[in-house]
């Protein structure tokens, strides 16, 4: 199987898991909850699972196919925040604390800014 197939299969699984986790969170917190509990929970769980997977792959040498399907695919489809968390942790582990802080803060600020820019562009188009 190709790398693309591993990622695609895993991504489909992760997206379905995210959909159902979001529905469960809405059912628990209610549709009018002020705090986005579903996304919060998905990001935290996805980051936890990414840590478990990264640690397991490092110990077992689980292989590229598992990394692609589970890490890039399933967890990438479940939440891209897990990859962000892993990359930040790797920068910290390498001793580049300042770069890790810059990456974390910059990613959040740039991401939210990009979202507002996209909304602004679409308001101008509409």
Curated annotation (Swiss-Prot):
InterPro entries: FluC (IPR003691)
Annotated positions binding Na(+): 76, 79
Pfam families from the UniProt entry: CRCB (PF02537)
Membrane topology summary: Multi-pass membrane protein
Compartment list: Cell inner membrane
GO molecular function terms attached to this record: fluoride channel activity; metal ion binding
Transmembrane segments: 1-21, 33-53, 72-92, 97-117
GO cellular component terms given for this protein: plasma membrane
Domain of life: Bacteria
Keywords carried by this UniProt record: Cell inner membrane, Cell membrane, Ion channel, Ion transport, Membrane, Metal-binding, Sodium, Transmembrane, Transmembrane helix, Transport
Gene Ontology biological process terms in this record: cellular detoxification of fluoride
Family of this protein: Belongs to the fluoride channel Fluc/FEX (TC 1.A.43) family.
Function: Fluoride-specific ion channel. Important for reducing fluoride concentration in the cell, thus reducing its toxicity.
UniProt name for this protein: Fluoride-specific ion channel FluC
Organism: Novosphingobium aromaticivorans (strain ATCC 700278 / DSM 12444 / CCUG 56034 / CIP 105152 / NBRC 16084 / F199)
Organism lineage string: Bacteria, Pseudomonadati, Pseudomonadota, Alphaproteobacteria, Sphingomonadales
